[in-house]
Amino acid sequence: MKVIYQTCCGVDVHKSFLVATIVKTTGGIEPSYQKKRFSTFNNSILEFKQWLLDNDCHDVCMESTGKYWVPVFNLLEDEINVVIANPKWVKAVKGNKDDTKDSKWIGDLFRLGLVKGSYIPCKIVRILREYTRYRYKLVSCRSSEKNRYQNALTVCNIALDSVVSDIFGKSSTSIIDYLLEQSGTSINHEEIASKILKRLKSKENAVIESVEGYQMTDSQKYRMRLVRAHMDYITAEINDVDKMIETLISSNIDFENAVQLLCTIPGVKRDSAITIISEIGTDMTHFSNSKRLCCWAGLTPGCNETGGKKKSVRITRAGVYLKPALVQCAHAAVKSDKSPYYKKKYESLVKRRGKKRAIIAIARMILTAIYQMLSTGEQWNPSDLYKIDIPAPLVEKQKAKAIKQAKNLLQREGILPPDEPLAS
């Protein structure tokens, strides 16, 4: 095999230490090895960096072990080319295995160019990514608390969620506050009616019936107050994170331009655009083409075939944060009547492939468009958009023409009898 890196280093990273092996190819067939162990404290990592520079080693490869690779990467990235590899691509043969042999194995694979590097964006994108991912977790946590709150109402024989559309709306919140303050199980109908806003006045009797005879103990009241306080706290945290994200976006002209560009796509709003930018960045040169980006995002079918038998070809589990954002945009895009491009595509796909596959296909179309837009700087304007915006009379004319052509083909093949000539 051809040697790609004459001098490189393989690193096996752990929580408290790392083992590094420098691999040098000096002209012979067998390379030479230098091995050393360092602590993961900052001073020791800087010593490791200096050791690499002293040995004229500017290419390092290590596997992405948890978050342990991040401190090492942060201190090396300014002067050294660091490649982070998925552990499945650098896995050593089981059996004769230890930390030193692992680092040597990683170095040998990297030296021959057999290691696929993971996409690590620049520092400002990584900072934005930390905020958007934390916001995603906060929203998920708040959703869990909302479910607990609704379950508590069900346990207390309160069926308010069967009447109102939003159990956390103003009317519902006022009614639940009133119930939490009561000492018994009886309610004042006039008091309940006074807390119902105009939009809900038509359902006044149903609202009163839904809370009549509720059973709420002191322990359940205490638990509901805790859950609500936690929801309010999480909401405040989300607002703070949103402010920080907006500050980062507004302070970087490339981010702001990219967000404005992505917002021209049907179904993509500002929050979704920011999430997408935080995951893939604005520089598309890291991906050779749009197919590689879609594969990295987990939106392409798998390839698992052996002996002429095809096994599971489901999409991969990649894109844990990016894929949900794109699927959310796809759901919004296929419901848009103002820009029906993806809606028409979806309606065509769903007949043949089903709803789930059709949504994933639309999400991939959106990501492909994003790749082209960020690469060229052009706004969303697909080349086949004219096919979607055809006037209705022209569509009917094309349908009639297609039916006529199909009929002529069937007649030539003898499947249909020829038309009888008109009587003169």
Regions flagged by a language model, labelled:
Residues 1-424:
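A detector of single, family-specific signature residues
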